[in-house]
Amino acid sequence: MLTFIGLGLFDEYDVSVRGLDAIKSADTVFLEVYTSVLMGAPIERLEAFYGKKITPLYREDVEIHADKILDAAEFGNAVFLTAGDSMVATTHSDLRIRAADRNIPTTIIHGASITTAVCGLSGLQNYRFGKSVSVPFPYGKWFPMTPIEVISANLKENLHTLVFLDIQKDKERYMKISEAVDLLEEQARRVDAGIPLYVGIARAGSPEPTVHAGNAEEMKAFDFGSPLHILIVPATLHEIEREYLERFAGLC
């Protein structure tokens, strides 16, 4: 059996009761650490809370060397833990398909997801979001333009854009909102586009999340504090959305 369990957004206390029961009864516990991380709970705290040894998994462990996971699930009870909700990342869907190819039973226990948490924190209506996009760290001469293309297409349809910021867990490197805004502004400059407003969110799901809305210069000057950070590029605001951002995100 392979059970996919979403752990929620911030620390060890965000897992559901059903998820916790499944972890405690598992023979093998894997934790995927490359699409997102629980910043409020290092792996040692998770192990202490669950009473289980946890094997961390990086991208190649899941996408290339998944047999270790599948073997554990074929011959025992394995759980595959992720921050947020398990099936938001395509790579996790692929793992479930490969398990089915080997006739391994699978099940999903959902957790809170950043894709819905940002709506509560920002007040932006979830049905008004278009395609999401990720901003990676540039590498050498590689400077992808996909983010501004997606944002521009969404704005044309009057849709908000959720912008994920790069995570390099193996290097303990987490993109900041100020870095992402710099990259997006450079992309916008290259295609003669404009981004009039951003909403930045830090540490969603924690006891003290930070939310701030403003233009590029305001966002780069604002101190969002420690990671994880995420961005939204809003379309034209509904009056309720605007009032929410004014009250809870410092929008002027």
Curated annotation (Swiss-Prot):
MF terms in GO: diphthine synthase activity
Keyword annotations from UniProtKB, A to Z: Methyltransferase, S-adenosyl-L-methionine, Transferase
GO biological process entries: methylation; protein histidyl modification to diphthamide
Entry keyword Mitochondrion: no
Stored InterPro entries: 4pyrrol_Mease, 4pyrrol_Methylase_sf, 4pyrrole_Mease_sub1, 4pyrrole_Mease_sub2, Dphthn_synthase
Binding site residues for S-adenosyl-L-methionine: 9, 85, 88, 113-114, 165, 204, 229
Description of how the protein assembles with itself and partners: Homodimer.
Family: Belongs to the diphthine synthase family.
Matches recorded under PANTHER family: DIPHTHINE METHYL ESTER SYNTHASE, DIPHTHINE SYNTHASE
Annotated protein name in UniProt: Diphthine synthase
Originating species: Methanocorpusculum labreanum (strain ATCC 43576 / DSM 4855 / Z)
Lineage: Archaea, Methanobacteriati, Methanobacteriota, Stenosarchaea group, Methanomicrobia
Gene (UniProt): dphB
